[in-house]
C-alpha cells in the first residue's frame, strides 16, 4: 500500500493522532505502517511548571510574587491547553481590575473560573437554600479534614458557578497506584455533603447529584474493574480493547449482575453511614 511506501527513499513520514487507539483496525498498527506509538499522558507537576513558563512569556507584566511551582501544584489534571487558558484568563481578569501586572490571585481566580465556570452572584437563592448549601459544602470540608487519605481541601464556596450552587475544590495527590482505603476515603468525603444535610436538617435534597454520580462510578470501578471486592473476587470486567462497546450482552450472568449491584450499593451505603457518624461526632466543627 501507499502507507508501506513504494520506494525506499521517498522521505515521507505519516503521522497520526487519536484518543481512541483501542478501536483502530489492528492492520493499521502493523510494522511498516504506524509502527511507532507514543502515548502522551496529561502533564505531571514538573511538566505543568514548564508549560506555565512557556505561556507566561507573552504576558508582558507578571507580578514577582507569582510562583510557577505553586501554580503547577494547584492545577492537577490540567492539560497544556487548560494551562494556556488559565494564563489568558488571568490576564483578562487583571485587565478588568485595572491592574498593572498579573498577580497570583488573578491566576487562582482564573483556575476557579475554568474549573467551576462563571460566577452567578445575581442568582436568586432563598436564605433556607443558602443555609442548606453552606452545610452541604461544610460537610465535604469537615470529612476531608478528618480522613487520612481524602484529598486536601483548597477552597469552599457557596457562590453559584456554572450549574452548581456551591462547590468544594480539592488538591488530589497524583498517585500512580491507588489503595482501597484511599478510594473509600474519597467516597466518604464526596458523601459528606448529603450526610451533613441529614445530620443538621434530618432531610436530604437533590443537591448531591454530582456527588452521587462520582461515588457510583468509583464504587463500580472498585467492584468491576479493579477487583477490589471480596464477594465478586479478583476479576475484572473491563475490556481495554474497546470491543465491549459493540456488544449487546454483559460478560457475566444475571446472578453476578445482581451481586455486583448489591456490592456497589453496600459500598456506597457504608461510606454514607461512616460520613454521618463522623459528622455526628464532630457536629461542633461542622457548625463552625
Over which residues does each language-model region extend?
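Asparagine-centered polar/low-complexity signal
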Residues: 1, 19, 85-88, 282
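Conserved catalytic/switch belt of AAA+ P-loop NTPases
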Residues: 1-36
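Conserved C-terminal "switch" segment of AAA+ ATPases
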Residues: 7-13, 26-27, 40-108, 113, ...
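Conserved RecA-like P-loop NTPase ATPase core
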Residues: 18, 34, 48, 79, ...
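Short, glycine/charged-enriched secondary-structure capping and boundary segments
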Residues: 28-33, 53, 148, 171
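N-terminal alpha-helical segment
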Residues: 30-33, 64-68, 86, 271, ...
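Short pre-active-site segment immediately N-terminal to the catalytic Zn-binding motif
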Residues: 122-132
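Soluble catalytic regions of large protease machineries
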Residues: 132-134, 141-288
